[in-house]
Amino acid sequence: MANRFLRPNLIHRFSTVSPVGPPTTIIPEILSFDQPKPEVDLDLSDQARLFASVPISTLLRSTAILHATSIGPMVDLGSWLMSSKLMDTTVTRDLVLRIVKGTFYDHFCAGEDAAAAARRVSSVYESTGLKGMLVYGVEHAEDGGACDENIQKFIETVEAAKTLPSSHLSSVVVKITAICPMNVLKRVSDLLRWQYKNPNFKLPWKLNSFPVFSGLSPLYHTTSEPEPLTVEEERELEKAHERLKSVCLRCQESNVPLLIDAEDTILQPAIDYMAYWSAIMFNSDKDRPIVYNTIQAYLKDAGERLHLALRESEKMNVPIGFKLVRGAYMSSEAKLADSLGYKSPVHDTIQNTHDCYNDCMSFLMEKASNGSGIAVILATHNTDSGKLGARKASELGINKENGKIEFAQLYGMSDALSFGLKRAGFNVSKYMPYGPVDTAIPYLIRRAYENRGMMSTGALDRQLMRKELKRRVMAW
């Protein structure tokens, strides 16, 4: 089978590849994989088998919630209400949060604290065989005080994870935006971009990491030479490294993988820099990386950056884990690029995004199967990608239980795909955020928008759940 990575329509033909330098660097040969045909023994049509472990009460609630989030005007109304001044009134706020907690929150979130979330992880595993990814649901921090509070919550997450059998838990998740002030991440990203454009530009605070840019990376965020970090900014960056180090150490001691979530391209260079620094520091076990970074396949530079990071990790003999996703900031990325007079960094068509995801998936699976220190979590709600991944694993003869390859979906979404992959023998996990109801509102609104419309992510689940409910009622 031809080993070719990243198709010509996704990555141009380049002459060289370099981790540093202006965007004139290009890959000599396109390393793209011939994708397997999606036909595979992954049956997503037999709803009775897929939802056999789900009680009828859960099916009823899930169907109702997914149906509600598919109605555009209802989603818009809910989003408006959550951000309106009505929420400033105690009575209204308490009423709305109680309703949300008993419906959308319980469907998409794991609990209000780490202990409750750990119990939910065990409950889900015992009833379905699906593992859990535990994540404290806070997203951003504006100052060092908030970062200090958040890192304690992430440490609590690891402590809760330690109480679970290893078979129940896939990993814990940390957001760099919650442990480093946003303004510092933006400044670091600007300086990293400027150094990439001007390799002689010195960054005295910079630690050892892998490449975070490629010839296709968007650099328009930084149009002039940034000021050096102030003493206070350097101090905050050092504190952020210490916070990340503290949670990495606990994960390493407990043998619990740590996934680092991605953000938009304004901040992503700094996040990649910190993720790869921590991978170099803590990924010492050749068979099981501790630190995983996230690759967003909807970005045009995703394949090149993945290739460069992997090449550097192999050079340094550092194992690395990746979580592969499509991406969640399409609208904001397009708006920012347009406002600055540039093309969006996101692929021009959804098919190009699908192709990039599937190519990166095939490439990573090849790497993971050949005994290298690569581990991959294939986070997808796309059934074709699920089928392609299952077929690729079969072609490569991958041991489905070896822990080097895993599929994942969000808790409360794409259950049919999760159950289908699990029935096919794969390790499958659910991304399970936890935290107080009010802090989960932004997350819940995003899930609602993803499910709206007849062709949304939740369409297959809604269809199969209704079919299974009808079958069970008719069987009475």
UniProtKB/Swiss-Prot annotation:
Expressed in the vascular tissue and in the abscission zone of petals, sepals, stamina, pistils and siliques. Not detected in petioles. Disruption phenotype: No visible phenotype when grown under normal conditions. No proline hypersensitivity. Pathway: Amino-acid degradation; L-proline degradation into L-glutamate; L-glutamate from L-proline: step 1/2. Its main location: mitochondrion. One of its GO terms (cellular component) is mitochondrion. It comes from the Eukaryota. It is found in: Mitochondrion. Keywords: FAD, Flavoprotein, Mitochondrion, Oxidoreductase, Proline metabolism, Stress response, Transit peptide. Belongs to the proline oxidase family. Converts proline to delta-1-pyrroline-5-carboxylate. This is Proline dehydrogenase 2, mitochondrial. It comes from Arabidopsis thaliana (Mouse-ear cress). The gene is POX2.
